[in-house]
Amino acid sequence: MFTKHYDVTIHNAAGAAETISLRLPFAAQSALGKKYSKDTISLILAAATDNDIFVDVLTNSLNWKGNANAITTGEELVEALIDEGVICDDVSRVRLMIEIGKASGFISDAKATALEREMQAIEDNLTKEPEEAEADKTETEKN
């Protein structure tokens, strides 16, 4: 039986490419929601800035029934993803969470696109010069 999941490629200690398959099972979504008192979408977005939530989501996403992942802890995966350049900031962490959400059936393609646009706007704003960002803010407040 095929199980939908999100694949990311990392390199192991020997330098060989390994595919890691991520999916957050429904039971894990429910358990994490109760643990952190958040609905699933809020949990995913909170993972951008909360290391405990991020690691918990990754650990649960690694260990779904039928997976063949060599890595089994979120901590190991975070280090591997940093080394690969997959995650380097809060925005890249949210993007990874969005992909896991799509593969796990709780974020639609349309919702993912909307979230990506929001993330891009945040990223664009963060890379602006302070004067340019302030001018944009003033223009937005006028409208």
Name each region found by the language model:
Residues 1-11, 34, 39-43, 68-143:
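Charged interaction scaffolds used for protein-protein
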Residues 1-57:
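Short N-terminal mixed-charge amphipathic segments
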Residues 53-64, 95-102:
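Short, hydrophobic/amphipathic alpha-helical patches that form generic packing surfaces
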